Amino acid sequence: MNLLSKNSPVEQSINKMKEVLKDVGCEASFSQEKHPLENCFSVNLASNEAPNHIYSNGKGVISDASIASAYGEYIERLQTNNFFIDFHLPNRKYFPDEVAFDFGGDYLNPELKEIYDADGELEDKDLVDFNSDYMDKIVALPFIRESDKVKTYIPINILSNLFVSNGLATGNTANEAKVQALSEIFERYAKIAIIKEGYALPKFPDELVKSFPKVYKDVQDLRKLGYIIEVLDSSLGGVFPVTAISLINPINNTLFVSFGAHPILEVSLERTMTELMQGRDLTNLDAFEIPTFDMSLVSDSFNIEAHFIDSNGKIGFPFLSAKKSFEYAPWKYTGNGSDAEYAFLLDILASQNREMYVREYTYLDFYSCQMIVPNFSEVYPLDDMVYNNKNNGKLIRDMVLNFEKYDVNDILDTVDSLDDSLNMQLYIGVIFKENFTMGDFKAQMLLLLQEYDDALEILEFSSNKFGHLVAQLIRMNNDEIEWADYEEALYNVYGKEKIQRAVNILEGKEFLINRTLHQDYNNMLSMFDKLEVKKLAFYKN
């Protein structure tokens, strides 16, 4: 069966992608399919090696479409290394064609330097990547500027801090994937503008929505359940091929908005509807946010990040205003096939006076690409490179993993300003068997110095329940409470084994934190190494 906008039968695509994963030795398993509405299907595809960390989601108007979507996203993120972008990759190159530049090297062309260092605040250290062992090199990947096919090197740290997965795509053909990637870029650009500016969007005429039976049927079914559903023109005045569907749950006063994009309106609307229901049942359409008039909260970068992760963030009441920000202006597309769709999208990009850079991947024998449109397709604000750089965690990675090699006072001086609630494995890019927070780490350092009162202040406010036990024993010592008076009570409440471990920690015989790496992390590195074999064979030619 050929789906609208796809260049191969869906069954053929699925079989091909299965073979790709089997060939590289990175097979994955599906979760149970969700099918809440007649034309909405979604699945989760997780790696067998590290299922909580390496996974993709798929959606579609039929079951096979959602399966193909999940496989496509999985291969896209596998082949582009996006699955590994948040992890330390010790003694490994990110890609064979990367270049590790000295500070001040020939990375970024003048136009890109003007964009990413407009205020002159960006330093070379801000461009050091998160993944490698380099501390004094800038690892960059070659991209091709679409307008003139000139190569430029873009630091990985810009890609991971600002763009993450935006603009990644996989397809049966190059242009099919490029249409997907550029459509996604336009969708997220319009979405962020609509949310931050509080734009009120015009509705699509009901007669037009009726002409797309799958979408109309699912809209009507949601309305019958009591939800207030609107199908909205998100083109920002006919500029971008973007649509939205809003859902108000009047029972708990929440609002959720999904977005979709594609040159073909029907495809855009189907994507928007399946996005609305992705990973959801009809029983959990009550976990959304209540709208607000506080637009500073809505436009906050943390809220925008929430919208990027799972579309569930705050929406401002201005979005619901009866006074619309734009006239209804559907875009006009009459072409046929991926080549025409891509040309249509490139014309839109040209109308916005934007340059696009493309990196292509085919070493798994299935096409993937990464597209970036500087000062347009970034998901995170440009000043994150200076004030919220992901590579900050790299600076303390070895301190955390091997703190015995360092002076404890130096460690505390280094981490003192860091938030106690920081998730340590996310911050430094590993997976621990037992994860801990920055506060737990600080407390451990203080315990090594026998600064028990300072450790107590952290432990009592920690989410670490075992830390609470250690805190109680510190209080007993401070208050000179007789052990014999409470030994039986402590054993009854906590158990003898935990009490003995807590005593050992206070005596310096054991550590509060466990730095043992989870097997999932080792499995993930093995996955990376399997890909490396394919990369080397491809790039050598």
Model-found features: residue ranges?
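Helix-biased "structured C-terminal domain" signature
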Residues: 1-541
